[in-house]
Amino acid sequence: PISELMPEFFSDDPEDWRNEISLEHSLTMTWGYKWPGDYILSDPEHPLWLWKDEAERFEIALNREWQADPGTSFVYDSTSSHFLSGVITENSGMSTLDYANQHLFYPLGIRQPDGSSVVWNQDPTGYYEGGFGLSLTPRQMAKFGYLILKKGQWEDQQLVSSEWVESATNAQVDVMLPGKGM
């Protein structure tokens, strides 16, 4: 459970449903929270834009209205992805960008033309955005597609497990939105 990886944001109450949220639930956006889907993203009152400038993002993400048991319902929700950025930072001893550079971007040859790291936005507290804000060129994005086609292998390195690629490219939960969710 994510509660074991970032316990400061979770309750000690064993009955609290949030303590059942796993990394898989967060990765698949099935962690159980309600996210208003009736807003148009360009609307300045969209919850994403209101949430974007908040310093207490993790607390806000976890203290929203509950919708379904974790793992049972897909809701496109960038807060679950952002929470993963916090998990990476707090458990790897490096920022999400440094971790991605070491384990993914640099092995894939993904850098700026001057050789520096890619551009990735940070939230008000310094965590890298987990759900958006990463700037890549089409050629750099194509490398991810090729990595998936090669089942996680890049040249002579296995960057992500073939089991993960298999799981990530198959349906995880039935969704009501055609073309969204895996």
Residue ranges and their predicted role:
Residues G37-L41:
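Short, solvent-exposed loop/turn and secondary-structure capping segments
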Residues P1-Y33, N63-W66, S92-G131:
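Active-site helix/loop module of the DD-peptidase/beta-lactamase fold
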Residues D16-E20, E54, S73-D77, S81, ...:
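Solvent-exposed, acidic/flexible segments
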Residues F10-P14, E45-L48, D69-F74, S85-E90, ...:
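Second-shell loop/turn segments in exported
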Residues P1, S26, L84-I88, M141-I148:
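Active-site SXXK
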Residues E59-E65, F74, S92, D98, ...:
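Penicillin-binding protein/beta-lactamase superfamily catalytic region
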Residues L5, H82-F83:
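Acidic/histidine-rich, surface-exposed loop or edge segments in extracytoplasmic proteins
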Residues D43-N63:
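Amphipathic alpha-helical interface segments
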